[in-house]
A protein has these predicted regions:
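Residue-level detector of conserved, function-critical positions
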Residues: 1-281
Length: 281
């Protein structure tokens, strides 16, 4: 669970405030991450990493050369030898520092890289459940799938058994949103695939965003942006210079530049302008 405390920066120091703007943790920290699982990463004057709770109390001393955010009760840490392992929320080392890199836990598994810089996955006991054979420093599971990269730097997906379910054939793969992920082919064109790897929207766009409320922004060959549905049909023509915010509660924010000014508009799912924002120089 994420905290309602928000990080603030004043006089070159970090602190935290609540939703009402009240300072809960004074701005006296050299560096701070966001709260995750009730703890936030901090860095002291010696550039050592530790963690505080939501009262500002240091609950894990600043003794690590690096640390990641807590996820599923564990945080990755790096020791003085440059090796990574994991601690629990008491600061106890639960997985020894023996890996070249380590990502956060997601769906019970965390990515690690071995001495050959090959990537695999371990469980919360530290056992290797997916052998180290892939490239890239980090990977995370979402909805049972994790993106992987092969020796040719092509992207695909594996499931939690390590089986390749979407072959490594793409230059880029985005996260799945509403069942579809955007992909980039060798011609630098974008389209969308489903979780079986089937191409649902052909790679024909110069840019593409995630699906939200059934629509995704796309960019045409003229650099203009519009929206498509999940079948690939253009439902809002490409006429905008930028999409500032995807659809939420039936409204998206788009922008055009005219004579050096940025003009913002709220549009509905029919593409109709229903409100205007300010103009910025």
């Amino acid at each position: 669970m994420n905290s309602k405390l928000q990080k603030v920066y004043r006089d070159s120091k970090y602190g935290f405030m609540d939703e009402m703007g009240n300072i809960i943790i004074p701005c006296q920290l050299n560096s701070a991450g966001d709260f995750r699982d009730g703890l936030a990463r901090i860095v002291d004057q010696d550039k050592k990493h530790g963690f505080i709770d939501e009262t500002g109390k240091i609950v894990i001393p600043c003794q690590w050369n690096e640390a990641g955010d807590f996820s599923e009760g564990f945080a990755s840490v790096m020791d003085e030898n440059g090796k990574h392992g994991f601690i629990d929320k008491t600061g106890k080392v639960v997985i020894p520092c023996q890996w070249n890199e380590a990502g956060g836990f997601s769906e019970g598994l965390a990515s690690v890289t071995d001495e050959n810089n090959k990537l695999g996955f371990i469980d919360k006991t530290g056992n290797v459940v997916i052998p180290c054979q892939w490239f890239g420093p980090y990977a995370f599971f979402s909805a049972g799938l994790a993106e992987i990269v092969d020796e040719n730097w092509k992207h695909g997906f594996i499931d939690k058994t390590g089986k390749v379910v979407i072959p490594c054939q793409w230059e880029y793969i985005g996260d799945f949103s509403e069942g579809l992920a955007r992909v980039e082919d060798e011609d630098k064109k974008y389209g969308y695939i489903d979780k079986t790897g089937q191409i649902i929207v052909p790679c024909q766009w110069n840019g593409a965003g995630d699906f939200s409320e059934g629509l995704a922004s796309v960019k045409d060959e003229n650099g203009k942006r519009g929206f498509i549905d999940k079948t690939g049909n253009v439902v809002i023509p490409c006429q905008w210079d930028y999409v500032e915010a995807d659809f939420r509660d039936g409204v998206a924010v788009v922008m055009n530049i005219r004579n050096g000014s940025m003009h913002f508009y709220d549009i509905n799912k029919n593409g109709k302008v229903i409100g205007k924002g300010g103009n910025f120089f």
